[in-house]
Amino acid sequence: MSAETAAANTATAPVPEVQEQESSKSKQVNLTPAPLPTSSPWKLAPTEIPVSTISIEDLDATRKKKNRTPTPKSSTATKWVPIKASITVSGTKRSGSKNGASNGNSNKSKNNKTAASSTSSSNANRKKKHHQHNAKKQQQMKKDGFESAVGEEDSKDATSQENGQSTQQQQPPHHRNHHHSHHHNSNGPQRRKFHNSNNAGMPQNQGFPPQFKPYQGRNARNNNNNRSKYHNHFHHNQQHPQQPMVKLQQQFYPVQPVLMAINNIARQIEYYFSEENLTVDNYLRSKLSKDGFAPLSLISKFYRVVNMSFGGDTNLILAALREIVANEAATVNVAEGTLAAKEGDNVTGEAKEPSPLDKYFVRSKSWSNWLPETFETEINIEKELVGDALDQFMISLPPVPQQEEESSTELASQEQETKEDSAPVAAGESESSL
């Protein structure tokens, strides 16, 4: 028994070497670094296709494909039928006893609608007859020789618009837009507004129409002898309700907008050659000759002058030039001469139509301060114009017909007679009442 127990104890007892190995393995831990990540957590763009190599054409093609809307497919069985609209009126449900009243109300509303439509149609017919009657009257008046009177009635709206424009032009106008070539060639800043300094010393009522101020130039000296020959004639015409008409470009215009246009053009021409404008107007300075003159035909193509002269009417521009020549206090000189032709001017070979503005030239009185470095324009001056040299371009006002004066006197006498007749009747009634 002792031998068996000894063998069992040896089998169950642990071996010391094996225990030491196991304890050493448990104490030693192998630490290895983590592997590098294969994909970025921020989801960056792949480096296989760089952004610089992507063509814009491919992007446009993809955008067009995305923006394409699917086209509807129509089969042969599709049939388009027009819609027949039916008007339905919604209302509250009522009992059978009230249906009769509702039907009666609906019938009354229908009758009212038909009556209103009939009255509107009758009014429309009356208006048509009235317009036809007026048209016949106008035709008859034209045949009898009263075309000017009819033209005045038709041009009331046009004159009101022109008066509004002319009053706006009477105010200091903004920097004018020159011809299209001026827009491309001028490099200066925007021009200042044109301030008219001659309105302070002018008399208010000189017999001219309302809002009309006779031209006295930019530097007025309160001269009453300003050679304005429109004064006496228009003072006589202002007493009559109808303004005389002036014929320009085969059309008749009232006198008031015509005279205001002449004055505005004269002031605008003086502004172009003022120190305020020439300091910034490189285009106009480049067109000056060695004597400081600029062609009037060039100035007439400027934007503001074209608008003020009813589309570039030469009669209005020459009338404004006459006002400048007749004004002793004008800030510009006007001369008569010829423009020397240069080689290469007429490249197309077309003959240029002559204009009455071609022989007139304008310059500032301080022209020596604004001469350009190189002269593009050559002008042969014949003489300077002063006084009444251009009186032939003054627009003549038509005389007032005497029939209007006779009719006005007859109306005044009739009113006096009616007043005299009514006075004793009132006195008799008062005596009978007492």
From Swiss-Prot:
Purpose of the protein: May overlap in function with tropomyosin and may be involved in organization of actin filaments. Acts as a multicopy suppressor of RHO3 mutation. RNA-binding protein which may modulate mRNA translation. Involved in heme regulation of HAP1, as a component of the high-molecular-weight complex (HMC).
Cellular component terms per the entry's GO annotation: cytoplasmic stress granule; cytosol; nucleus; transcription repressor complex
Biased composition (Polar residues): 26-41, 158-167, 196-208
The species this protein was found in: Saccharomyces cerevisiae (strain ATCC 204508 / S288c) (Baker's yeast)
Keywords: Cytoplasm, Isopeptide bond, Phosphoprotein, RNA-binding, Ubl conjugation
Span of domain HTH La-type RNA-binding: 255-351
GO molecular function: mRNA binding; RNA binding
Protein name per the record: RNA-binding protein SRO9
Gene Ontology BP terms: negative regulation of DNA-templated transcription; positive regulation of translation; regulation of translation; response to oxygen levels
Glycyl lysine isopeptide (Lys-Gly) (interchain with G-Cter in ubiquitin), cross-linked positions: K156, K301, K342, K352
Region listing for Disordered, in residue ranges: 1-243, 396-434
Basic residues bias: start-end ranges: 125-140, 173-195, 228-238
Compositionally biased residues, Low complexity: 1-13, 93-124, 218-227
